[in-house]
Amino acid sequence: MNKIMIVEDSEDIRGLLQNYLEKYGYQTVVAADFTAVLDVFLREKPDVVLLDINLPAYDGYYWCRQIRQHSTSPIIFISARSGEMDQVMAIENGGDDYIEKPFSYDIVLAKIKSQIRRAYGEYAAKQGEKVVEYAGVQLFVERFELRFQDEKSELSKKESKLLEVLLERGEKVTSRDRLMEKTWDTDIFIDDNTLNVYITRLRKKLRELNAPVSIEAVRGEGYQLRAQS
């Protein structure tokens, strides 16, 4: 069952969207605290986000940019703004589609289905998309998405870069310096503890997926992956 996150400050519209989508078999989650939209997204991991532009505290463009730092999940803007520039800004800030209010619920449903097909279904993993795999664990590089069997986990851009290097190397040891160079790609000094934090996060996400892979530290050398039997 696909999960749809609704970020809409009108209780009436929010309720109608929930009822309509649930009638067609979707699970819905609502962001009611408009200062914590990203927190809800990271906790609930929705497949599609319906996002209004005119919101209390921060607008929809802001939240779209915040989400894009962590995920490539489809984001559909739903707004009363009908100007061409509003639609341009929605796309430039990371949105995938735009629906004007007032809207047809059938159109909303059709666009959700289209985005799900594109991101996860028959149009997913298009030719040329990079997928790195080790011991059954798959990383969809462009999506920052980690998968094992039927479970998935969204990664941040840095987590994805780091795991990409480790998956490509497999059981070969990769030095800490090499991992930091590949992940941060910058001349700015990166504290060793920063790498430790990201390794800890990746270990946690692999455990949550019950993936048969662990990230092992090799004293004085770096890190390697180890397939578990």
Curated annotation (Swiss-Prot):
| Response regulatory domain residues | 3-116
The places in or outside the cell where this protein is found are: Cytoplasm
Output the CDD domains linked to this UniProt entry: REC_OmpR_NsrR-like, trans_reg_C
Task: Give the record's GO biological process terms.
Answer: regulation of DNA-templated transcription
The organism's place on the tree of life at top rank: Bacteria
Q: Which Pfam family is an annotated match for this chain, by its short name?
A: Response_reg
**PTMs per UniProt:** Phosphorylated by YxdK.
Single GO MF descriptor:
transcription cis-regulatory region binding
The record's principal subcellular location, in a coarse class, is: cytoplasm
Q: Which residues carry this modification: 4-aspartylphosphate?
A: D52
Its GO CC terms?
Answer: cytosol; protein-DNA complex
Q: Which residues bind DNA?
A: 129-227
Q: For this UniProt record, give its keywords in alphabetical order, as a comma-separated list.
A: Activator, Cytoplasm, DNA-binding, Phosphoprotein, Transcription, Transcription regulation, Two-component regulatory system
- Protein role: Probable member of the two-component regulatory system YxdK/YxdJ. Positively regulates the expression of the yxdLMyxeA operon by direct interaction with its promoter region. Could also indirectly regulate the expression of the dlt operon.
Write the protein's name.
Transcriptional regulatory protein YxdJ
Q: Which organism is it from?
A: Bacillus subtilis (strain 168)
What gene name does this entry carry?
A: yxdJ
